[in-house]
Amino acid sequence: MQAELSLPIVMKGMIMNWNLIQLSSLMPNAIFLRLKRNPFDVVNSLYKARSTHSGDYEKWWSFKPPEFEQLVQLPAREQVAGLFLSIENALDRAFEQIPNNQTITVDYVDFCRNPNEFFKTLEHKFHGFGCELELNQVKPFKPSAGSGSENTTRWNKAFDLVQKEVEFIKY
């Protein structure tokens, strides 16, 4: 698609989290967007999605990271914490190695409060590839409610256990 259109691509490809470096070398005009969000909000969302999609918090839901066989042996919260850490490790590694002109990192709350600032960044990235992009201005919107602090202690324990028990891929 990129070669056919001769245009840069902006993508959010969760399935590619562990292969972004290879993808960037195949598509040098691709732009990779990383949306950073409060880790506790992310793990709470993933945890709730298990129940929503399967009716059971214990059943795996989402992509299987390279550490899946280790994670699936752990309790549900630790599985979710491990999935989050695996994704973050892969994205950290990728965004360190992919050229800056191909990446955008945006904070979720900042994006919600000022989406037009993100649009300016996106327009600038496209311009760097010789492509003009004009996005309509939009009004800020309210970020989804955070998880609060009630689960923070439980999740911190889950993160600690996973970091001790799971051998994460060293990139």
Over which residues does each language-model region extend?
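PAPS-dependent sulfotransferase catalytic domain
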Residues: 1-35
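Short, flexible loop/turn elements at secondary-structure junctions
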Residues: 14-17, 39, 110-112
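PAPS-dependent sulfotransferases, especially Golgi type II membrane carbohydrate sulfotransferases
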Residues: 47-171
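Short, well-ordered alpha-helical microsegments
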Residues: 17-21, 43, 115
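Long, well-ordered mid-to-C-terminal structural blocks that present hydrophobic/aromatic surfaces
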Residues: 22-65
